[in-house]
Amino acid sequence: MKLAILGAGCYRTHAASGITNFSRACEVAEMVGKPEIAMTHSTITMGAELKELAGVDEVVVADPVFDNQFTVIDDFAYEDVIEAHKEDPEKIMPQIREKVNEVAKELPKPPEGAIHFTHPEDLGFEITTDDREAVADADFIMTWFPKGDMQPDIINKFIDDIKPGAIVTHACTIPTTKFYKIFEQKHGDLVTKPETLNVTSYHPGAVPEMKGQVYIAEGYASEDAIETLFELGQKARGNAYRLPAELLGPVCDMCSALTAITYAGILSYRDSVTQVLGAPASFAQMMAKESLEQITALMEKVGIDKMEENLDPGALLGTADSMNFGASAEILPTVFEILEKRKK
């Protein structure tokens, strides 16, 4: 299998967050006995996993930065990074972030410059600046592109070189639905049948070098292609999840924090209503729908920054406490503390 990676990534944004580390990359490095994998990041980590753990025999990375200032920081011994991550990553991550931030001050942003700690060629990858060259005869095309609005112009340069049946994936910078539209608008005949072009995601849900997981969107690829990618993801990333394309953003992107809170609330509320009160699931669903729709309507009407002015958080303290039993009781006490702090 040939894997084409379009976009090598840059570590500066990962360092800037102050919370990321190389836990997954170090784990893979130890698993396969190749220390140089320990400080890979972004698509380079995922490419190394696919090559070393899933048997992908050809990996080509395309990025214009290879003709510009592709910078490899070699201040840190891979073995030291691996050892630190066995105990506490924060024993070494502050020094790494400090060095990256220092280099980033003088280095232009992608595609003119990028920060790495391992050169892809040292992992047995081929490199090129030509996307068309990379995607030629590729079975799996993993894109790691800038924000969505820039992607049509990038994709249109190589779309005619994608072979029928190829799997094409996106990550965190565009929804699957919008990603698919780019291909549909240019080559409707290429995507009318899923088996002719399989558009989906290989979304890590976090920085790839930190967590071993991948999320694969269903709806725009054949079942065979999804299953192939799922099996690759399980071998390479350790944990793979299939989900409808429209749920990829709520589950994987920044709003996942809100999705987690909301989903836990729905499940707990459902169980309290159906298991303790004995009400039918249809009633619980009706009430849940009313809550979600009206709170969403309030946010859209007044704006997320003015919600408290229109609904005092304290108004819920004397009503929601009557549902503080069953599964809901596992969540509500903490919720009450938050509402109490925010009430007028």
From Swiss-Prot:
Parts of the chain that traverse the membrane: none
Keyword Oxidoreductase: yes
GO molecular function: N5,N10-methenyltetrahydromethanopterin hydrogenase activity
Keywords: Methanogenesis, One-carbon metabolism, Oxidoreductase
Ways its activity is controlled: Activity requires salt; 100 mM sodium or potassium salts of chloride, phosphate or sulfate are equally effective. Inactivated by O(2).
Catalytic activity: 5,10-methenyl-5,6,7,8-tetrahydromethanopterin + H2 = 5,10-methylenetetrahydromethanopterin + H(+)
Annotated thermal dependence: Optimum temperature is 60 degrees Celsius.
Enzymatic class: oxidoreductase
EC number, as in UniProt: 1.12.98.2
Pathway: One-carbon metabolism; methanogenesis from CO(2); 5,10-methylene-5,6,7,8-tetrahydromethanopterin from 5,10-methenyl-5,6,7,8-tetrahydromethanopterin (hydrogen route): step 1/1
InterPro entries per UniProt: 6-PGluconate_DH-like_C_sf, HMD, HMD_C, HMD_C_sf, HMD_N, METHMP_Hmd, NAD(P)-bd_dom_sf
UniProt entry tagged with the keyword Oxidoreductase: yes
Cross-referenced Pfam families: HMD, HMD_N
Subunit relationships: Homotetramer.
NCBIfam families named among the record's database cross-references: hmd_TIGR
Family: Belongs to the HMD family.
Name this polypeptide is given: 5,10-methenyltetrahydromethanopterin hydrogenase
Organism placement in taxonomy: Archaea, Methanobacteriati, Methanobacteriota, Methanomada group, Methanobacteria
